[in-house]
């Protein structure tokens, strides 16, 4: 296989040399060896003006989507749309991406007016240039061949321009009493689409909390419910993990009314959200819009869906002192230091189940289980 790869590259290089010599015509007969080498080097120099960074990025984003990396594709697509607004056109010669260009783009991100009511945070100002750097590196990997001395993209703007480190994300966890307010909030009269969406958002938020922070993409896509458990592969990370990021969550009694309310009777999926929304992104957007109304009712500015997941983890760890590794596992995260050990262990979700039971009881009743354990 290695021999074939070398042969293919050599054949390609010979073809390029032959094409250059053919273009030289009769001049070739009068040239010295040094002059010929100069002409060959000139002919092999990259025509960088033909490398459109926007078109290249669109192709890479499509590859991500086809590989099932929808979340990553969405982030890169948002970045490229921002870049197009900055340059005010749909094409960008890769040679234009210099350290000065990136500094101007960063300033644009800091100064520009947001397209929505939400302010573009420091994390986005860091993330967008970071995604551009990643795409630029992919382009260099594709168009350059250092082994054969073919360098079509010689610039390294990110050697001088350093992507800023993001500021720590704003903590999105809510105290137990606020979570209880959201969960127990009565449905509003569905007199308009806004109130209907708010009721849905409240239910989905509660469902997520009861299911250990299950996110909207997984609530939308999951298709396995059996023996009182929902088993699913986490959409965000399943393509990056050997275990497909699979996890099983016990349906606690408090979650059952919501499971039954949104249950898909056709059994194509666990929940029928896909019948009302054509994509997980559309479903997520509707839930987050509805949560803004719920936030107003419970006194939380800019309430976000992910607060359910963050709050579950914080309450489990800080209020109930659940073992940090159990919280880590319940959130379906991977500990690199434990990867080898995990290969030998059969998955056991009982500790996750116990932690979830304690969290739900604590939020709804205030009972942290300490007295009960002390009596034993």
Where are these regions (language model features)?
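N-terminal DNA-binding recognition helix of tyrosine site-specific recombinases/integrases
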Residues: 82-85, 95, 115-157, 214
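Active-site/catalytic core of tyrosine-dependent DNA strand-transfer enzymes
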Residues: 179, 252-301
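C-terminal catalytic core of tyrosine-transesterase DNA break-rejoin enzymes
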Residues: 206, 210, 214-217, 309-333
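Conserved tyrosine-mediated DNA breakage-rejoining catalytic core shared by Y-recombinases
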Residues: 220-261
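Short, polar N-cap/turn motifs at the start of nucleic acid-interacting alpha helices
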Residues: 224-231, 301-302, 322-345, 366-376
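Catalytic-site neighborhood detector that most strongly recognizes the C-terminal catalytic loop/helix
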Residues: 234-240, 331-361
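C-terminal secondary-structure termini that scaffold catalytic or DNA-interacting sites
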Residues: 253, 274-278, 338-339, 351-376
